[in-house]
């Protein structure tokens, strides 16, 4: 039985009937997705989240989208890839990596996101990154691009690009590096193997951290363990949460979308 349903998906992210294949619609779909569906490391037990390659898209659709629990990049961006494909977009999976991800997993095929080609132009689209980043399509271009007070640029490297961001009062920093090499889901097998090794390591007690976030009208909010970060009009504020009750309340607010 095919559970994945385009109209249910569109309604869940507040875009019912938005079936156009154009940049304006794509931008609305991406930002609405980021506002409606959180990034959440808590949506799945790690043992249930190791199937990156042979992902059951119907099961993930129910948990991550229909129930609104969110998930990681390989849940959210893979389902968004399917949604865009079924709407008629030309979509290509891409792989990226962060410095932390390379250190943790030892692979450059870490982060999963998408490239959309519209009228001969390429756009980066990402609905599953757990940190300050672009909330609308980003042109694959050397130009500096501004979104809601933050600036973005793509810096060419020997093996691809470095996506960099600068806030209203911060310096340029790398979000992640990537190439535009088209990917297959099987390319994430190495990451999956690393997940399985992590789960199987009985000496580790830190296998699942609290990492969640979502967008709002003019910014984003993230909680990583006890570090609470808000970005509003490009301005960042960071707090360390020491009170357990406040921590639990913030987790609930980020996941529910109630930013207060």
UniProtKB/Swiss-Prot annotation:
EC number: 4.4.1.-
Matching Gene3D superfamilies: 3.30.2140.20
Active site: 73 (acyl-thioester intermediate), 111, 126
One GO BP: antibiotic biosynthetic process
Signal peptide coordinates: none
Family matches, as Pfam families: Acetyltransf_2
Keywords associated with the record: Antibiotic biosynthesis, Lyase
Knockout-associated phenotype: Inactivation of rifF gives a rifamycin B non-producing mutant that still accumulates a series of linear polyketides ranging from the tetra- to a decaketide, also detected in the wild-type.
Transmembrane regions listed in the UniProt entry: none
SUPFAM superfamilies, alphabetized: Cysteine proteinases
InterPro entries xref list: Arylamine_N-AcTrfase, Arylamine_NAT_domain_sf, Papain-like_cys_pep_sf
Involved pathway(s): Antibiotic biosynthesis; rifamycin B biosynthesis
GO molecular function, one term: lyase activity
Family: Belongs to the arylamine N-acetyltransferase family.
Biological function: Catalyzes the release of the completed linear polyketide from the rif PKS by forming an intramolecular amide bond, in this way terminating polyketide assembly and forming the macrocyclic compound proansamycin X, an intermediate in the rifamycin B biosynthesis.
Protein name, per record: Proansamycin X synthase
Origin organism lineage: Bacteria, Bacillati, Actinomycetota, Actinomycetes, Pseudonocardiales
Gene name tied to this protein: rifF
